[in-house]
Amino acid sequence: MAKFASIIVLLFVALVVFAAFEEPTMVEAQKLCQRPSGTWSGVCGNNNACKNQCIRLEKARHGSCNYVFPAHKCICYFPC
């Protein structure tokens, strides 16, 4: 019984040591470039509608209403 317990403890210690030396994997963030929506018309006042239109119609990653002088415009974000 004591031999079994020492094997379990040894396996646990080996697992802890292995986990301590494991490097965390980091995913590199992809840069996004912005440009005004080509399908949006008028002043942008609804972020969700702008986002959906950018994603569905222009195949962008994201979209939002941003202030660009003189009004809010729908801006789409694409991978650079």
From Swiss-Prot:
It comes from the Eukaryota. Changing K73Q: Decreased antifungal potency and increased sensitivity to inorganic cations. Changing Y77I: No effect on antifungal potency. The modification Pyrrolidone carboxylic acid is found at Q30. Changing Y67A: Decreased antifungal potency. Disulfide bonds join C33-C80, C44-C65, C50-C74, C54-C76. Belongs to the DEFL family. This is Defensin-like protein 2. It comes from Raphanus sativus (Radish). The gene is AFP2.
